[in-house]
Protein backbone atom coordinates (compact mmCIF):
# COMPACT_ATOMS: atom_id res chain seq x y z
CA UNK A 1 0.00 0.00 0.00
CA UNK A 2 1.28 3.44 -0.93
CA UNK A 3 0.03 6.83 0.11
CA UNK A 4 0.57 10.20 -1.54
CA UNK A 5 0.95 13.09 0.88
CA UNK A 6 -1.77 15.65 0.23
CA UNK A 7 -1.75 18.12 3.10
CA UNK A 8 -5.27 18.83 4.29
CA UNK A 9 -6.73 15.51 3.17
CA UNK A 10 -4.75 13.01 5.26
CA UNK A 11 -3.61 12.48 8.84
CA UNK A 12 -0.36 11.16 10.28
CA UNK A 13 -0.50 8.94 13.35
CA UNK A 14 2.74 10.07 14.97
CA UNK A 15 2.76 7.45 17.71
CA UNK A 16 1.47 3.89 17.84
CA UNK A 17 2.78 0.40 18.53
CA UNK A 18 1.68 -1.74 15.60
CA UNK A 19 4.29 -4.37 16.39
CA UNK A 20 2.69 -5.27 19.74
CA UNK A 21 0.99 -8.61 20.43
CA UNK A 22 -2.43 -6.92 20.58
CA UNK A 23 -2.33 -6.67 16.78
CA UNK A 24 -1.13 -10.20 16.03
CA UNK A 25 -4.60 -11.57 15.12
CA UNK A 26 -5.44 -8.91 12.51
CA UNK A 27 -2.46 -6.64 11.89
CA UNK A 28 -2.97 -6.61 8.10
CA UNK A 29 -6.61 -5.60 8.53
CA UNK A 30 -5.68 -2.88 11.03
CA UNK A 31 -3.19 -1.40 8.57
CA UNK A 32 -5.71 -1.57 5.73
CA UNK A 33 -8.38 0.17 7.85
CA UNK A 34 -5.90 2.91 8.66
CA UNK A 35 -5.08 3.36 4.99
CA UNK A 36 -8.76 3.42 4.03
CA UNK A 37 -9.53 5.93 6.81
CA UNK A 38 -7.11 8.47 5.31
CA UNK A 39 -4.09 7.87 7.50
CA UNK A 40 -1.27 8.98 5.23
CA UNK A 41 1.57 7.78 7.42
CA UNK A 42 2.05 5.84 10.63
CA UNK A 43 5.05 5.98 12.94
CA UNK A 44 5.36 2.80 14.96
CA UNK A 45 7.38 3.52 18.07
CA UNK A 46 10.02 1.26 19.58
CA UNK A 47 9.99 0.60 23.32
CA UNK A 48 12.07 -2.55 23.85
CA UNK A 49 14.39 -4.70 21.78
CA UNK A 50 11.69 -6.92 20.29
CA UNK A 51 9.44 -3.91 19.64
CA UNK A 52 12.19 -2.05 17.83
CA UNK A 53 12.85 -5.04 15.63
CA UNK A 54 9.15 -5.48 14.86
CA UNK A 55 8.68 -1.82 14.04
CA UNK A 56 11.62 -1.86 11.65
CA UNK A 57 10.21 -4.91 9.89
CA UNK A 58 6.84 -3.18 9.42
CA UNK A 59 8.53 -0.03 8.10
CA UNK A 60 10.33 -2.10 5.48
CA UNK A 61 7.14 -3.87 4.44
CA UNK A 62 4.82 -0.85 4.08
CA UNK A 63 5.61 2.34 2.21
CA UNK A 64 3.60 4.55 4.58
CA UNK A 65 4.83 3.08 7.87
CA UNK A 66 7.88 4.61 9.54
CA UNK A 67 9.67 3.65 12.73
CA UNK A 68 11.53 5.03 15.70
CA UNK A 69 13.98 3.10 17.85
CA UNK A 70 14.50 3.53 21.57
CA UNK A 71 14.09 2.05 25.04
CA UNK A 72 11.10 2.87 27.24
CA UNK A 73 11.65 4.02 30.86
CA UNK A 74 9.60 1.07 32.11
CA UNK A 75 12.35 -1.24 30.85
CA UNK A 76 15.33 0.95 31.71
CA UNK A 77 16.51 -1.55 34.34
CA UNK A 78 17.17 -4.03 31.52
CA UNK A 79 19.15 -1.57 29.39
CA UNK A 80 22.70 -2.68 28.58
CA UNK A 81 25.59 -1.44 26.49
CA UNK A 82 24.80 -4.20 24.02
CA UNK A 83 21.21 -2.95 23.67
CA UNK A 84 22.43 0.61 23.25
CA UNK A 85 24.81 -0.43 20.49
CA UNK A 86 22.01 -2.31 18.73
CA UNK A 87 19.70 0.73 18.87
CA UNK A 88 22.50 2.92 17.56
CA UNK A 89 23.21 0.47 14.73
CA UNK A 90 19.55 0.37 13.70
CA UNK A 91 19.18 4.14 13.90
CA UNK A 92 22.33 4.67 11.84
CA UNK A 93 21.55 1.99 9.26
CA UNK A 94 17.90 2.87 8.70
CA UNK A 95 17.92 6.62 9.40
CA UNK A 96 15.78 8.58 6.97
CA UNK A 97 18.20 10.37 4.67
CA UNK A 98 16.25 13.28 3.22
CA UNK A 99 12.90 15.07 3.55
CA UNK A 100 11.58 13.69 0.25
CA UNK A 101 12.51 10.05 0.74
CA UNK A 102 9.76 7.76 -0.49
CA UNK A 103 11.91 4.67 -0.90
CA UNK A 104 12.27 1.62 1.28
CA UNK A 105 15.35 1.74 3.47
CA UNK A 106 15.62 5.06 5.25
CA UNK A 107 12.60 4.69 7.50
CA UNK A 108 13.85 5.48 11.04
CA UNK A 109 12.59 8.96 11.81
CA UNK A 110 13.38 9.36 15.51
CA UNK A 111 14.76 8.06 18.80
CA UNK A 112 12.05 6.90 21.14
CA UNK A 113 10.04 6.11 23.11
CA UNK A 114 12.40 7.44 25.79
CA UNK A 115 11.92 9.42 28.96
CA UNK A 116 10.84 9.10 32.59
CA UNK A 117 7.87 7.44 34.27
CA UNK A 118 7.57 8.17 37.99
CA UNK A 119 3.98 6.91 38.17
CA UNK A 120 4.66 3.20 37.87
CA UNK A 121 8.38 3.23 38.75
CA UNK A 122 8.94 -0.09 36.98
CA UNK A 123 12.63 0.86 36.89
CA UNK A 124 14.61 2.78 39.54
CA UNK A 125 14.49 6.50 38.87
CA UNK A 126 18.26 7.00 38.70
CA UNK A 127 18.53 4.25 36.08
CA UNK A 128 15.65 5.82 34.14
CA UNK A 129 17.48 9.15 34.12
CA UNK A 130 20.79 7.61 33.03
CA UNK A 131 19.19 5.68 30.17
CA UNK A 132 17.23 8.77 29.12
CA UNK A 133 20.38 10.91 28.98
CA UNK A 134 22.29 8.32 26.99
CA UNK A 135 19.56 8.08 24.34
CA UNK A 136 19.22 11.86 24.13
CA UNK A 137 22.94 12.05 23.36
CA UNK A 138 22.46 9.44 20.63
CA UNK A 139 19.66 11.50 19.08
CA UNK A 140 21.85 14.60 19.12
CA UNK A 141 24.73 12.69 17.53
CA UNK A 142 22.52 11.37 14.73
CA UNK A 143 20.46 14.54 14.26
CA UNK A 144 17.18 12.74 14.93
CA UNK A 145 14.16 14.05 16.86
CA UNK A 146 13.18 12.34 20.11
CA UNK A 147 9.84 10.93 21.22
CA UNK A 148 9.50 11.61 24.94
CA UNK A 149 7.39 9.78 27.51
CA UNK A 150 7.02 11.79 30.72
CA UNK A 151 4.60 10.83 33.46
CA UNK A 152 4.66 12.56 36.85
CA UNK A 153 8.28 13.52 36.12
CA UNK A 154 7.97 17.11 34.94
CA UNK A 155 10.93 18.63 36.79
CA UNK A 156 13.50 15.97 35.92
CA UNK A 157 12.28 15.58 32.33
CA UNK A 158 12.55 19.29 31.56
CA UNK A 159 15.91 19.65 33.30
CA UNK A 160 17.42 16.69 31.45
CA UNK A 161 16.06 17.74 28.06
CA UNK A 162 17.12 21.37 28.56
CA UNK A 163 20.67 20.29 29.38
CA UNK A 164 20.96 17.76 26.58
CA UNK A 165 21.29 20.09 23.61
CA UNK A 166 18.41 18.31 21.86
CA UNK A 167 15.89 20.85 20.58
CA UNK A 168 13.59 18.87 18.33
CA UNK A 169 11.12 16.20 19.22
CA UNK A 170 7.73 15.62 20.78
CA UNK A 171 6.25 15.15 24.22
CA UNK A 172 3.95 12.30 23.29
CA UNK A 173 0.47 11.69 24.72
CA UNK A 174 0.84 14.88 26.72
CA UNK A 175 -0.44 14.66 30.29
CA UNK A 176 1.37 17.57 31.93
CA UNK A 177 0.23 21.09 32.79
CA UNK A 178 0.33 24.29 30.74
CA UNK A 179 3.63 25.37 32.30
CA UNK A 180 5.24 22.12 31.19
CA UNK A 181 3.84 22.50 27.69
CA UNK A 182 5.11 26.08 27.41
CA UNK A 183 8.58 25.13 28.65
CA UNK A 184 8.75 22.18 26.27
CA UNK A 185 7.72 24.37 23.32
CA UNK A 186 10.27 27.01 24.35
CA UNK A 187 12.98 24.38 23.85
CA UNK A 188 11.52 23.55 20.43
CA UNK A 189 9.39 20.49 21.18
CA UNK A 190 5.97 19.67 19.80
CA UNK A 191 3.06 18.62 22.00
CA UNK A 192 1.16 15.52 20.88
CA UNK A 193 -2.46 14.93 21.84
CA UNK A 194 -3.97 11.45 22.05
CA UNK A 195 -7.33 9.81 22.76
CA UNK A 196 -7.78 11.12 26.33
CA UNK A 197 -8.63 14.55 24.89
CA UNK A 198 -12.01 13.03 23.96
CA UNK A 199 -12.78 12.02 27.56
CA UNK A 200 -15.39 14.09 29.41
CA UNK A 201 -13.24 14.53 32.51
CA UNK A 202 -10.10 15.67 30.63
CA UNK A 203 -10.73 19.39 31.20
CA UNK A 204 -7.09 20.34 31.82
CA UNK A 205 -5.89 18.53 28.70
CA UNK A 206 -8.68 20.09 26.66
CA UNK A 207 -7.70 23.59 27.81
CA UNK A 208 -4.07 22.94 26.91
CA UNK A 209 -5.04 21.49 23.54
CA UNK A 210 -7.02 24.62 22.73
CA UNK A 211 -4.02 26.83 23.58
CA UNK A 212 -1.11 25.07 21.83
CA UNK A 213 0.19 27.23 18.94
CA UNK A 214 -0.41 25.67 15.53
CA UNK A 215 3.28 25.10 14.80
CA UNK A 216 3.69 22.82 17.85
CA UNK A 217 0.60 20.60 17.58
CA UNK A 218 0.67 16.88 16.75
CA UNK A 219 -1.90 14.10 17.15
CA UNK A 220 -1.49 10.38 17.78
CA UNK A 221 -3.32 7.24 18.85
CA UNK A 222 -0.73 5.50 21.07
CA UNK A 223 -2.51 2.37 19.85
CA UNK A 224 -3.28 -0.17 21.19
CA UNK A 225 -3.70 2.06 24.26
CA UNK A 226 -5.87 5.09 25.14
CA UNK A 227 -8.75 4.50 22.76
CA UNK A 228 -10.77 7.67 22.09
CA UNK A 229 -14.50 8.05 22.50
CA UNK A 230 -16.77 6.56 21.21
CA UNK A 231 -14.65 3.37 21.25
CA UNK A 232 -13.19 3.77 24.73
CA UNK A 233 -12.69 0.37 26.34
CA UNK A 234 -11.77 -1.37 23.08
CA UNK A 235 -8.34 -1.89 21.59
CA UNK A 236 -7.15 1.30 19.93
CA UNK A 237 -5.91 1.41 16.33
CA UNK A 238 -4.64 4.08 13.89
CA UNK A 239 -7.98 4.37 12.05
CA UNK A 240 -9.45 5.86 15.24
CA UNK A 241 -7.18 8.91 14.94
CA UNK A 242 -10.04 10.72 13.21
CA UNK A 243 -11.98 10.87 16.51
CA UNK A 244 -9.10 12.55 18.31
CA UNK A 245 -8.72 14.95 15.38
CA UNK A 246 -12.41 15.85 15.51
CA UNK A 247 -12.18 16.63 19.22
CA UNK A 248 -9.07 18.77 18.70
CA UNK A 249 -10.76 20.68 15.86
CA UNK A 250 -13.81 21.41 18.02
CA UNK A 251 -11.66 22.60 20.93
CA UNK A 252 -9.68 24.95 18.69
CA UNK A 253 -12.67 26.26 16.73
CA UNK A 254 -11.37 25.15 13.34
CA UNK A 255 -12.38 22.58 10.75
CA UNK A 256 -11.24 18.96 10.58
CA UNK A 257 -9.49 19.85 7.33
CA UNK A 258 -7.57 22.58 9.18
CA UNK A 259 -6.39 20.09 11.83
CA UNK A 260 -5.37 17.62 9.14
CA UNK A 261 -3.32 20.26 7.36
CA UNK A 262 -1.72 21.69 10.53
CA UNK A 263 -0.75 18.40 12.15
CA UNK A 264 0.32 16.71 8.93
CA UNK A 265 2.63 19.60 8.08
CA UNK A 266 4.12 19.56 11.59
CA UNK A 267 4.72 15.81 11.47
CA UNK A 268 6.30 16.03 8.02
CA UNK A 269 8.55 18.84 9.18
CA UNK A 270 9.61 17.19 12.45
CA UNK A 271 10.13 13.66 11.17
CA UNK A 272 11.20 14.56 7.60
CA UNK A 273 8.41 12.53 6.03
CA UNK A 274 7.13 13.40 2.57
CA UNK A 275 7.59 16.52 0.50
CA UNK A 276 7.05 19.94 2.06
CA UNK A 277 5.08 22.52 0.04
CA UNK A 278 7.57 24.59 -1.90
CA UNK A 279 5.37 27.39 -3.24
CA UNK A 280 3.37 30.01 -1.37
CA UNK A 281 -0.41 29.83 -1.72
CA UNK A 282 -2.42 32.69 -3.21
CA UNK A 283 -5.76 31.59 -1.77
CA UNK A 284 -6.01 29.53 1.40
CA UNK A 285 -9.03 28.18 3.21
CA UNK A 286 -9.50 28.29 6.99
CA UNK A 287 -12.84 27.09 8.36
CA UNK A 288 -15.48 28.39 5.89
CA UNK A 289 -13.53 31.46 4.78
CA UNK A 290 -11.10 31.91 1.90
CA UNK A 291 -8.12 34.20 2.50
CA UNK A 292 -6.22 35.98 -0.25
CA UNK A 293 -2.45 36.31 0.04
CA UNK A 294 -1.61 38.99 -2.52
CA UNK A 295 1.61 40.47 -1.12
CA UNK A 296 4.24 39.82 1.55
CA UNK A 297 5.12 43.52 1.75
CA UNK A 298 3.99 45.60 4.72
CA UNK A 299 4.39 49.12 6.10
CA UNK A 300 4.70 47.74 9.64
CA UNK A 301 7.35 45.47 11.12
CA UNK A 302 5.35 44.20 14.08
CA UNK A 303 7.38 42.25 16.63
CA UNK A 304 4.60 39.66 16.94
CA UNK A 305 3.99 39.13 13.22
CA UNK A 306 4.07 35.49 12.20
CA UNK A 307 5.85 36.30 8.90
CA UNK A 308 9.09 36.90 10.83
CA UNK A 309 8.94 33.46 12.46
CA UNK A 310 7.33 31.03 10.02
CA UNK A 311 6.27 30.53 6.42
CA UNK A 312 3.04 28.88 7.54
CA UNK A 313 -0.39 29.84 8.87
CA UNK A 314 -2.71 26.96 9.81
CA UNK A 315 -0.55 24.68 7.67
CA UNK A 316 -0.67 26.95 4.59
CA UNK A 317 2.60 28.16 3.05
CA UNK A 318 2.21 31.93 2.58
CA UNK A 319 5.75 32.83 1.51
CA UNK A 320 5.25 34.21 -2.00
CA UNK A 321 7.98 34.01 -4.61
CA UNK A 322 6.12 36.55 -6.78
CA UNK A 323 3.03 38.68 -6.25
CA UNK A 324 0.07 37.16 -8.11
CA UNK A 325 -1.71 38.79 -11.03
CA UNK A 326 -5.45 39.49 -11.01
CA UNK A 327 -6.06 36.48 -13.23
CA UNK A 328 -4.05 34.23 -10.92
CA UNK A 329 -6.07 35.45 -7.93
CA UNK A 330 -9.36 34.78 -9.73
CA UNK A 331 -8.25 31.29 -10.70
CA UNK A 332 -7.21 30.59 -7.11
CA UNK A 333 -10.62 31.72 -5.80
CA UNK A 334 -12.84 29.73 -8.13
CA UNK A 335 -16.49 30.25 -7.20
CA UNK A 336 -16.70 33.04 -4.58
CA UNK A 337 -20.21 32.06 -3.48
CA UNK A 338 -19.00 28.82 -1.89
CA UNK A 339 -17.30 30.69 0.96
CA UNK A 340 -18.76 32.50 3.94
CA UNK A 341 -16.32 35.36 3.33
CA UNK A 342 -13.37 36.09 1.10
CA UNK A 343 -10.74 37.95 3.09
CA UNK A 344 -7.80 39.96 1.82
CA UNK A 345 -5.26 38.87 4.43
CA UNK A 346 -1.86 37.35 3.76
CA UNK A 347 1.65 37.95 5.03
CA UNK A 348 1.55 41.60 4.02
CA UNK A 349 -0.64 44.69 3.82
CA UNK A 350 -3.23 44.07 1.06
CA UNK A 351 -3.95 47.76 0.47
CA UNK A 352 -0.44 48.16 -0.91
CA UNK A 353 -2.09 46.62 -4.00
CA UNK A 354 -5.18 48.82 -3.94
CA UNK A 355 -6.10 48.50 -7.62
CA UNK A 356 -5.98 44.72 -7.47
CA UNK A 357 -8.03 44.71 -4.25
CA UNK A 358 -10.71 46.90 -5.84
CA UNK A 359 -10.88 44.90 -9.06
CA UNK A 360 -10.99 41.52 -7.32
CA UNK A 361 -13.50 42.75 -4.72
CA UNK A 362 -15.81 43.98 -7.47
CA UNK A 363 -15.41 40.65 -9.31
CA UNK A 364 -16.30 38.76 -6.10
CA UNK A 365 -19.38 40.91 -5.44
CA UNK A 366 -20.66 40.32 -8.97
CA UNK A 367 -20.53 36.59 -8.19
CA UNK A 368 -22.45 36.80 -4.91
CA UNK A 369 -19.43 36.66 -2.63
CA UNK A 370 -18.78 38.62 0.56
CA UNK A 371 -15.59 40.64 0.93
CA UNK A 372 -13.57 41.54 4.01
CA UNK A 373 -10.24 43.34 4.22
CA UNK A 374 -7.81 42.84 7.10
CA UNK A 375 -5.54 45.89 7.14
CA UNK A 376 -3.07 47.77 9.29
CA UNK A 377 -4.99 50.97 8.55
CA UNK A 378 -2.20 52.69 6.64
CA UNK A 379 -4.09 52.91 3.34
CA UNK A 380 -4.62 56.67 3.40
CA UNK A 381 -1.01 57.25 4.46
CA UNK A 382 0.28 55.07 1.62
CA UNK A 383 -1.67 56.91 -1.10
CA UNK A 384 -1.79 60.33 0.56
CA UNK A 385 -5.54 60.49 -0.04
CA UNK A 386 -8.73 59.07 1.41
CA UNK A 387 -9.10 55.71 -0.37
CA UNK A 388 -12.15 54.54 1.60
CA UNK A 389 -14.78 56.01 -0.78
CA UNK A 390 -13.23 53.77 -3.46
CA UNK A 391 -14.13 50.69 -1.38
CA UNK A 392 -17.77 51.63 -0.91
CA UNK A 393 -20.16 49.02 -2.29
CA UNK A 394 -17.47 46.41 -2.97
CA UNK A 395 -16.27 45.71 0.59
CA UNK A 396 -18.69 44.34 3.19
CA UNK A 397 -16.45 44.55 6.24
CA UNK A 398 -13.03 45.71 7.30
CA UNK A 399 -10.87 44.71 10.25
CA UNK A 400 -8.26 47.30 11.20
CA UNK A 401 -5.26 46.62 13.45
CA UNK A 402 -5.39 49.14 16.31
CA UNK A 403 -2.73 47.15 18.19
CA UNK A 404 -2.04 49.70 20.94
CA UNK A 405 -3.62 52.18 23.30
CA UNK A 406 -1.31 55.06 22.37
CA UNK A 407 1.26 56.28 19.87
CA UNK A 408 4.30 55.36 21.96
CA UNK A 409 3.25 51.75 22.43
CA UNK A 410 2.22 51.45 18.77
CA UNK A 411 5.58 52.70 17.53
CA UNK A 412 7.42 50.34 19.86
CA UNK A 413 5.63 47.13 18.86
CA UNK A 414 4.65 47.88 15.23
CA UNK A 415 7.68 49.86 14.02
CA UNK A 416 5.70 51.65 11.28
CA UNK A 417 7.20 53.19 8.15
CA UNK A 418 5.23 56.42 8.71
CA UNK A 419 6.06 58.97 11.39
CA UNK A 420 2.45 59.66 12.37
CA UNK A 421 1.13 56.17 11.74
CA UNK A 422 -0.97 55.84 14.91
CA UNK A 423 -2.86 59.06 14.23
CA UNK A 424 -3.30 57.87 10.64
CA UNK A 425 -4.80 54.58 11.84
CA UNK A 426 -7.28 56.39 14.12
CA UNK A 427 -8.32 58.63 11.24
CA UNK A 428 -8.68 55.62 8.94
CA UNK A 429 -10.98 53.94 11.48
CA UNK A 430 -13.21 57.02 11.67
CA UNK A 431 -13.42 57.33 7.89
CA UNK A 432 -14.04 53.62 7.33
CA UNK A 433 -17.36 53.81 9.16
CA UNK A 434 -18.67 56.25 6.57
CA UNK A 435 -18.17 53.90 3.63
CA UNK A 436 -18.02 50.28 4.84
CA UNK A 437 -20.99 48.57 6.58
CA UNK A 438 -19.05 46.62 9.22
CA UNK A 439 -15.90 47.95 10.88
CA UNK A 440 -13.98 46.41 13.75
CA UNK A 441 -10.52 46.91 15.23
CA UNK A 442 -8.13 44.38 16.71
CA UNK A 443 -5.37 44.25 19.30
CA UNK A 444 -3.01 41.45 20.29
CA UNK A 445 -2.39 40.40 23.89
CA UNK A 446 1.22 41.56 24.26
CA UNK A 447 3.28 42.85 27.19
CA UNK A 448 2.79 46.61 27.25
CA UNK A 449 -0.54 46.54 25.44
CA UNK A 450 -3.35 47.65 27.74
CA UNK A 451 -6.36 45.81 26.34
CA UNK A 452 -8.86 47.73 28.45
CA UNK A 453 -7.42 51.02 27.23
CA UNK A 454 -7.61 49.72 23.67
CA UNK A 455 -11.24 48.87 24.32
CA UNK A 456 -11.83 52.42 25.56
CA UNK A 457 -10.15 53.89 22.45
CA UNK A 458 -12.27 51.65 20.22
CA UNK A 459 -15.40 52.74 22.07
CA UNK A 460 -14.58 56.40 21.55
CA UNK A 461 -14.11 55.67 17.84
CA UNK A 462 -17.48 53.91 17.75
CA UNK A 463 -16.24 50.44 16.81
CA UNK A 464 -15.94 47.01 18.42
CA UNK A 465 -12.58 45.68 19.58
CA UNK A 466 -11.66 42.07 18.88
CA UNK A 467 -8.85 40.80 21.09
CA UNK A 468 -6.41 38.43 19.41
CA UNK A 469 -4.32 36.00 21.43
CA UNK A 470 -0.59 36.09 20.79
CA UNK A 471 0.51 33.16 18.58
CA UNK A 472 -3.09 32.34 17.61
CA UNK A 473 -3.14 33.20 13.91
CA UNK A 474 -5.71 32.47 11.26
Residue ranges and their predicted role:
Residues 115-119, 224, 312, 350-351, ...:
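Conserved radical SAM core fold
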Residues 315-330, 350-393, 404-405, 445-453:
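Canonical radical SAM enzyme core domain
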Residues 325-337, 342, 421-474:
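Auxiliary Fe-S-binding modules of radical SAM enzymes
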Amino acid sequence: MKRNFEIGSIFIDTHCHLEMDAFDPDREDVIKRAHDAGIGAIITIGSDLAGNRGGLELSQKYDFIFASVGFHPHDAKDFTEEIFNQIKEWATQFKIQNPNSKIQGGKVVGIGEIGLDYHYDHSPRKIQRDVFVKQLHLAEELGLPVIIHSREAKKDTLEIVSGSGVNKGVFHCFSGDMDMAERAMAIGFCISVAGPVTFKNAKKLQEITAAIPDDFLLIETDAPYLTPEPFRGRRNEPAYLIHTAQAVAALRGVSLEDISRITTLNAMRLFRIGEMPGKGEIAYKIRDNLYLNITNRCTNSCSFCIRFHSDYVKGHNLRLLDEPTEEEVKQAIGDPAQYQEIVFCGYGEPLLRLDLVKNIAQWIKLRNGKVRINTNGHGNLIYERNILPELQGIVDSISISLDAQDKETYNKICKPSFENAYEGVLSFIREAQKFIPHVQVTAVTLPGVDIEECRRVAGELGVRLRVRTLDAVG
